[in-house]
């Protein structure tokens, strides 16, 4: 391998601001910010808006969108085209 072409791989401290959770993960992400971690070492520090700790899909708090309203609205708009050949009751 050629020297000096690969990014530096190191431990980086990620902070999910929404869930107030910290992750210490190996990464090549560059940052000037640092923070002292629980183990007494100082690591590069990156803030996140969303991670697996706060995203609704991973936390199980994802809301299902009701399709009933969309189907009714479709029927109101285009139902006349489907009912042309049928007898009215």
UniProtKB/Swiss-Prot annotation:
Molecular functions per Gene Ontology: structural constituent of ribosome
UniProtKB keywords: Ribonucleoprotein, Ribosomal protein
Keyword Transport (UniProt): no
Keyword field contains Lipid metabolism: no
PROSITE patterns on file: RIBOSOMAL_L31 (PS01143)
BP term (GO), one: translation
Gene3D superfamilies: Ribosomal protein L31
One GO CC term on file: ribosome
InterPro entries reported in the protein's UniProt record: Ribosomal_bL28/bL31-like_sf (IPR034704), Ribosomal_bL31 (IPR002150), Ribosomal_bL31_B (IPR027493), Ribosomal_bL31_sf (IPR042105)
Subunit structure: Part of the 50S ribosomal subunit.
Family named by the database record: Belongs to the bacterial ribosomal protein bL31 family. Type B subfamily.
Name of the featured protein: Large ribosomal subunit protein bL31B
């Amino acid at each position: 391998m050629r020297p000096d072409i690969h990014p530096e791989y190191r431990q980086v401290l990620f902070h999910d601001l929404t869930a107030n959770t910290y992750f210490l993960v190996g990464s090549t992400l560059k940052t000037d910010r640092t923070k002292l971690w629980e183990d007494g070492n100082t690591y590069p520090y990156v803030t996140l808006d969303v991670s697996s700790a706060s995203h609704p899909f991973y936390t199980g708090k994802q809301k299902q969108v009701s399709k009933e309203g969309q189907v009714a609205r479709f029927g109101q708009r285009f139902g006349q085209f489907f009912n042309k050949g049928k007898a009215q009751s």
